[in-house]
């Protein structure tokens, strides 16, 4: 069983083996997370060449060979090369240096899987089949994108402010948990989905006041 985890990668080193379309997708997500990315591949897609030229990624223009991961000491390694032998060698070296590895074509060789995801600001939903069927994960993600539009990310920003205001009033974490359980219900989700953020926030604020008075 895989352990679900949201990982802070800002400023952390990650290495991608291979320079094709799969690598391009992995690298795009890593850069968005603030990772420092090295790609090892004899050739790159046009987009990755642009990233290398602009110094957004470091490019080692060679087919992977043992010893190439030691210099960068990555925390994560993604093996996406077309050469299965090179991928296998990279998996072995990644484990030897203590890095976690994802082998795109061989889920059983992977230490972790990258789920399909919906990302609106701090609002993040992920779907995974453990590498069993990426296509099914994408299908589920597409359905969830319709059910959870950008308004959910916008509402999370409001909830952060309300939560901080509640903390500033004091009362302790246990009391706050009781209050949040009382004010959060399906109606809030329906309002946010409909884009009625002001009304949803108003209901939350009224609920917080009422729940606080009862506690």
Residue ranges and their predicted role:
Residues 76-82, 87-114:
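ADP-ribose/adenylate-binding Rossmann-like module
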Residues 1-51:
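Hydrophobic, well-ordered beta-alpha structural blocks that scaffold small-molecule cofactor pockets
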Residues 55, 71-76:
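Short acidic/histidine-rich motifs immediately flanking catalytic phosphotransfer sites
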Residues 62-66:
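Conserved SAM/SAH-binding loop
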Residues 82, 103-153:
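E1/E1-like adenylate-forming module used to activate ubiquitin-like modifiers
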Residues 21-22, 84-85, 131:
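Residue-level detector of alpha-helix initiation sites
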Residues 131-215:
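An accessory alpha-helical subdomain
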Residues 37, 59, 100-101:
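Hydrophobic beta-strand scaffold residues
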